[in-house]
Amino acid sequence: MTAPREPFFPVDRSIRASDEPLEIRRLGRMGYQEAWDLQAEIAAARAAGTQGDVILVVEHPNVYTAGKRTQPEDMPDNGLPVIDVDRGGRITWHGEGQLVVYPIIKLAEPVDVVDYVRRLEEAIIQAVRELGVSTAGRIDGRSGVWVPSTTQAADPAAPKRDRKLGALGIRVTRGVTMHGLALNCTNTLEYYEHIVACGIDDADVSTLSLELGREVTMEEAEAPLLDALLKALSGELTVADHTFASAPDPIKVANEKARQARKAAQEK
């Protein structure tokens, strides 16, 4: 269920266990495994109480990461490396031109993982709307941030179906979060063509640049995203219902109509 639901505590309350300022570390371009090892090190220190909350901002070289629910049919056919990870979800791609943010924070008690995910989504929605994608929102039953098929992208090369702009994948251990969110900025969509991204085969993926018809760099997207994320975690930005219904896949609809026509012809 992706639509907001009543959280375990008031929506205007911080979801963090600490009110100390967050540390933001900009890692530049870093290999996925190295960044994952760094996350694990920080998360262990945070759980032990020897480290405060940290947000890592990073860009990865091209790589696929497979979450715990990845299926064999999701896997790539282009030979690019796949790293099995301990987050939720299925397979996705990370790479050049994609802004990746890993909040490593201690969640307030009682831990509400769903509320945490919704706050991450809300931050992405707020940021991409501020950048100009005014119809960005949620699809019920699917995580992440989407643009509906009823919205035409400024770049005609953009996909036409419902399309995902921001992806989420998290892990919470001992009340401390790992992994996080990825926002497509200037990246190519080529690598998504070789996988079933997030296990979804009836929708597409897009970028801020395609949606707005101009180059939207990671540097441009970073400031509004981090600002919205800090507000969402603190409770200043509350989760709202930006949910829209998933549009039927036109190819599947056409195939079903053809199947029904063949069946009707055979019955005559």
From Swiss-Prot:
Residues annotated as site: Lowers pKa of active site Cys: K164
CDD domains in the record: LipB
Active-site residues from the entry: C198
Binding sites annotated in the UniProt record for substrate: R87, G88, G89, R90, I91, T92, W93, H94, A167, L168, G169, G180, L181, A182
Reactions that this protein is recorded to catalyse: octanoyl-[ACP] + L-lysyl-[protein] = N(6)-octanoyl-L-lysyl-[protein] + holo-[ACP] + H(+)
PANTHER family reported in the protein's UniProt record: LIPOYLTRANSFERASE 2, MITOCHONDRIAL-RELATED, OCTANOYLTRANSFERASE
Protein name, as recorded: Octanoyltransferase
Organism: Corynebacterium aurimucosum (strain ATCC 700975 / DSM 44827 / CIP 107346 / CN-1)
